[in-house]
Amino acid sequence: MKTNAAERSRYKVADSHRHQSFVGVLRRDPDTYCWTWKGHIDFADGHNFSFASERSFSTKLEAEEYMRRFACNRIDNRLDSSNGGLF
């Protein structure tokens, strides 16, 4: 029998932003029930960037939203700096 979705403690998120893919893994600590995340960005030019949360979150949704914002901001910063700020 499958475990209840509310009891899951690990989720994988795969998405892209500005044609750059990123993957994140959200994990809930079994002792504190707080969520953390780590992930990586695969830039189209072959460079990769790994990242991890430096804090914990009360809910999965809060952790996922923060992780997505972090990845999108990192992608934007790298792409904007590599082309002189032009889209």
Description of each model-found segment:
Residues 69-81:
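Short arginine-rich
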Residues 45-65, 70:
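A short, exposed loop/beta-hairpin motif centered on an aromatic-Gly-Thr core
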Residues 39-43:
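Short beta-strand elements
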Residues 1-38:
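Short N-terminal "domain-start" leader segments
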Residues 1-3, 81-87:
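Short intrinsically disordered terminal tails
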Residues 3, 11-13, 57, 63-67, ...:
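Extended hydrophobic/Leu-rich segments
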